[in-house]
Every structure is written in structure tokens, then in C-alpha cells.
A protein has these predicted regions:
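Rossmann-fold NAD(P)-binding glycine/threonine-rich loop
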Residues: 83-87, 95, 103-130
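Conserved active-site and cofactor/substrate-binding residues in soluble primary-metabolism enzymes
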Residues: 7, 11, 15, 84-87, ...
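Short, ordered loop/turn segments at secondary-structure junctions
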Residues: 34-36, 78, 103-107, 137-138, ...
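C-terminal active-site/capping subdomain that shapes the small-molecule cofactor and substrate pocket
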Residues: 236-357
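General beta-strand structural signal in soluble alpha/beta enzymes
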Residues: 101-102, 132-135, 161-162
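Alpha-helical support elements that line or immediately flank enzyme active sites
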Residues: 140-153
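N-terminal glycine-/serine-/threonine-rich beta1-alpha1-beta2 phosphate-ribose binding loop
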Residues: 1-95, 215, 317
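Active-site-lining helix/loop region of Rossmann-like oxidoreductase modules
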Residues: 7, 151-279, 290-292, 315
Length: 357
């Protein structure tokens, strides 16, 4: 069994505890938290399980890493604290652990990552013997292994389009939803996530990963952004009220230009309520979906909807993201220490003999 730490117990961390506990080759050895109110609580309780796992949460990072865990699922947010997240991850890699995380967007395409992100990790790899694999947005397969798999099913490929379509009504991330994405803010508010260059920073690496898999070069990456206001005030269960006139939906594309055309596209359509921007793409059912469309011969379209925690689509997306990460740990522990991306790490098959916490 591979001793595995889950670092962070938010939306992704809860799913990570479940994934590690269910995996037949992993053993949950510790759970790290930053909130003093969570210290001492059982990991099963923090993950919303009915099972006591016998692992008490701690905030003692030094002690956990000194115990020599073989792997760390870093589930703490990097959206609003990227420097801190990088420092945490470098520390774990330097302690010799295999680290898997969705937190560092620039490292999704690690070969082209900025030096200030890449070099500290490589230094930690060289000194400590750990490894790092970053994946998990949209939700870690929708913009890399899935579209590339689908391109292999056709005779010709003209355009690859990856869509995430979500209604944030059920989300429990008010800071990210209101301030990073701008939901409910006045229409003259400039959401940081939509600032020029930020979509490319977050999703450009996945454009380049798909291009690398297809054996083509991306000439440039373009961004297209649209926003719509709410026509009526709406109330959400977990994040409160969003007033009419404030931002209610966004739609953006990150376009990989090949031969002068947008041929690799990552598109997001996000609403705070299903009543907003109904003329934009919608999921076939439910609150959200990930969709990949291959324009070519034949035209191929695949829509995937995942649910967890009582039918919650956002929780389902998180569960598949950490499923990919946790599933990569056994392979990473046998590979050479290094910095890996989604095209390096094989996607293992699941097993039928797992428990279901």
C-alpha cells in the first residue's frame, strides 16, 4: 500500500479523501488542514462519510512530511494563493513525495511553463527525489486524454472543441464565484478570471497538450469573452442572493490557431442560474456537463455528466478530477522522479473490487 496524504479538505479535498480511501493500492496516512476548527476531526467526517477512518486531521505540515509519505494529493486551492500553493508543493516534492494536484495551472503543460514555476519544482525533484503531476481542470481529462482519444476514432479531424457547461447554483465557493468569475457583480466589474491573458494562462497549456498529441504546432492562442446580466434576482442555497442586473453568465473560448484557423478550442459556458443566457449551449440534462466535439469525418460528439454527494454535478466533476490524480499515483511511484503532464501519465483502468465510501 502506498502511504498517501490528502492536503486540504475543501470541495476537492473531500473528494480526494474518498478517492484515496477507495483505491486498493493507496492508504490514507494523514490529512492536512489549515482551519484550526478542523484539527483533530476524523477524515471520514471531513469527507462527509458515514465511516470513521481513524485518521485525525492535523495542521503540522513538518511532522506529516517528516513521516515520509510516498504520495500527496494536494487539494488546497491555488486560485487565490498560487505562490503559497507552489511553495507547499515544492516542499512536499522536496521531501521525496509524489505529488498530484490540480492547483498550478501553468504546469498543466509543464514543458512550456514559466521558469519561475518550473525551476523550483525541478530543483525539488533533483534534491528530494519526488515527482509532480498537475491535472484536474475541466476536470483533468476533458481537455486532454478524452479529446485525443476521440480524434483516433475518425478518418479526418478538422476542429477539436472541448466544452464545460455549468450552472453554479449548487457551488459552495462564494469567493471564487463572486470575485474571480464575477457572478452577481456589476457588468462594469472586470472579473480577474476573464482579464486579458488569464484564460490563456489557465487553459492555454491544455491547448498545447492537445496540439502536441496531434503532432501540430499552435501559431497563437486567442481569447473570446462574452458576458450576460441576470434579468431577475435569483437565490442560491449555498451562496445567497444574486441581484438582477449583475453578471449572470459568461461564455469564453480559448482558441488554438493552427493554419490560421481556430482548430483547437476550449469553451466555457457558465451560469449562476439556468434562466440566464438560455440561447447559449446547455447541458442535455441536469446542471452541467463536459462535452467534446470532433468536427471531421465522422463528426463525433461525446457528453459526460458526473454526479456525487447526492446528485451534485460540481461534486461529480471534482470526483473525476481526483480519480484521475489518485489513479496516477501507483504509476508515478514506479517512474523516475520528475515533472509530468497528462500526455506522460497513462490513464489506468478502474477495478471492480474497490470499496465505495
Amino acid at each position: 500500500m502506498i502511504s498517501t496524504v490528502v492536503w486540504g479538505t475543501g470541495n476537492v479535498g473531500r473528494a480526494a479523501i474518498r478517492a484515496v480511501t477507495a483505491h486498493p493500492g493507496l492508504e490514507l496516512s494523514a490529512v492536512l488542514v489549515s482551519n484550526p476548527a478542523k484539527v483533530g476531526r476524523d477524515a471520514g467526517e471531513l469527507a462527509g462519510l458515514d465511516t470513521v477512518l481513524g485518521v485525525a486531521a492535523t495542521d503540522d505540515i513538518a511532522a506529516v512530511l517528516a513521516a515520509g509519505p510516498r504520495a500527496v494529493v494536494y487539494a488546497a486551492s491555488g486560485d487565490i494563493r498560487p505562490d503559497d500553493a507552489l511553495a507547499d508543493i515544492v516542499r512536499a516534492v522536496g521531501a521525496g513525495a509524489v505529488v498530484v494536484t490540480p492547483a498550478l495551472y501553468p504546469l498543466y503543460d509543464q514543458r512550456n511553463a514559466p521558469a519561475e514555476m518550473r525551476e523550483p519544482v525541478l530543483k525539488a525533484v533533483a534534491e528530494g527525489g519526488g515527482s509532480l503531476f498537475v491535472s484536474g481542470i475541466d476536470p483533468g481529462w476533458g481537455n486532454d486524454v478524452l479529446p485525443l482519444l476521440m480524434t483516433g476514432l475518425g478518418s479526418t479531424v478538422d476542429v477539436v472543441r472541448c466544452q464545460e457547461i455549468f450552472d453554479y447554483t449548487t457551488y459552495d465557493q462564494p469567493d471564487s464565484v463572486r470575485w474571480l468569475v464575477g457572478m452577481g457583480q456589476p457588468m462594469d466589474y472586470e472579473p480577474p478570471m476573464l482579464a486579458p491573458g488569464i484564460p490563456t494562462m489557465v487553459w492555454g497549456g491544455q491547448i498545447r497538450l492537445i496540439a502536441r498529441g496531434l503532432g501540430v504546432e499552435v501559431e497563437e492562442i486567442r481569447e473570446v469573452v462574452e458576458r450576460r446580466p441576470l434579468e431577475t434576482t435569483v437565490e442560491t442555497e449555498l451562496m445567497g442572493k444574486f441581484e438582477a442586473g449583475g453578471q449572470g453568465a459568461i461564455r469564453f473560448e480559448v482558441q488554438g490557431i493552427v493554419d490560421g484557423r481556430a482548430r483547437i478550442v476550449i469553451e466555457h459556458v457558465t451560469r449562476i442560474h439556468a434562466s440566464c443566457a438560455t440561447d447559449w449551449p446547455l447541458p442535455h440534462s441536469g446542471a452541467g456537463a463536459h462535452r467534446v466535439i470532433i468536427e471531421g469525418n465522422p463528426r463525433i460528439e461525446v457528453t459526460i455528466q458526473a454526479t456525487a454527494e447526492g446528485g451534485n454535478h460540481s461534486a461529480g466533476g471534482n470526483a473525476t478530477a481526483v480519480g484521475r490524480l489518485a489513479g496516477a499515483i501507483p504509476w508515478l511511484t514506479t517512474a523516475e522522479p520528475g515533472l509530468y503532464d497528462a500526455l506522460d501519465v497513462p490513464l489506468p483502468f478502474g477495478t471492480l473490487d474497490r470499496s465505495h465510501p
